[in-house]
From Swiss-Prot:
This protein's name: Protein TsgA
InterPro entries noted in UniProt: MFS, MFS_dom, MFS_trans_sf, MFS_TsgA, MFS_TsgA-like
Organism: Salmonella heidelberg (strain SL476)
Protein encoded by which gene: tsgA
Principal location: membrane
Membrane topology of this protein: Multi-pass membrane protein
TM region positions: 11-31, 51-71, 78-98, 101-121, 134-154, 162-182, 206-226, 245-265, 273-293, 298-318, 332-352, 361-381
Amino acid sequence: MTNSNRIKLTWISFLSYALTGALVIVTGMVMGNIADYFHLPVSSMSNTFTFLNAGILISIFLNAWLMEIVPLKTQLRFGFILMVLAVAGLMFSHSLALFSAAMFVLGLVSGITMSIGTFLITQLYEGRQRGSRLLFTDSFFSMAGMIFPMVAAFLLARSIEWYWVYACIGLVYLAIFILTFGCEFPALGKHAQHSQAPVVKEKWGIGVLFLAVAALCYILGQLGFISWVPEYAKGLGMSLNDAGALVSDFWMSYMFGMWAFSFILRFFDLQRILTVLAGMAAVLMYLFITGTQAHMPWFILTLGFFSSAIYTSIITLGSQQTKVASPKLVNFILTCGTIGTMLTFVVTGPIVAHSGPQAALLTANGLYAVVFVMCFALGFVSRHRQHSAPATH
């Protein structure tokens, strides 16, 4: 593979995470405007965004098999057509049913693209380099989470309709579409060149189960926490701007943490540093929930920084549980993480209704504690040391 081809594929991976980050994180910014557009209360409008999460979940789950049937380049190009149709549907329809369908299609497209992006990184890089590259790739999720809410705020403040925010997000996919030209993708399944040697199917091992549970609990805990921080802060008497600043601080430090750890992780055993980071994140979240208002910004900044490497490290460790990185295994862990996204409001909504936002934050804290336990237990069964040692760069 030529160096220019590798660079193009790496950039496709970066942008695939940016696309999903933009779609997921911008929701909170536009939800009120969309509710007004359809003359609905915000509470019932939030339920329609479940279609976006459902699309992401289904596509990541199915793409473990779809990758071996449909070439990756074909999937990305077809995804561009679907993206254009979905954005057009948002622009020209006043039907809530069509809005929900468009959101589902956007979820499908971003889920397929993100699973391809993750797989490309696991194919292009090995050993500890794979972990640092995946982490840098995941930082584009947070970067989009910082940039697109600002874009949304800029457009909405000028009374420009909310659907232009999604048109701007579509430009990310346009860049992916352009990069597919003159670019060779790894072939899988029936499209791959098969050697004479029979392919030995590797067993995943119990470590994959620990990682899958950790992925689900981490994403559910993270989104459950960050979704209710503004309400919790407002309940303490903070202004809407100050409450929003806490969320921005979290994602900003999360992004800087990813950049820092993409360098730091190369020097440590991944399972050990993951266990330390999971433990620190659980403690920092508890300090944020129980601390004073004056200390909350500092706790959320450090929480964002030290938790930034957790999810990507879980995926990297999963890919290292077999000698050859398995797209099915990587997609299985991604699917578990996406189930966490789907369950966010299903789990935290009733808790908030019954006991208030602080109870939801404490639940998220408990989920982070489960992540720590899973990562600690993984140390006794993980195969990453025997598989990554020869491949370390």
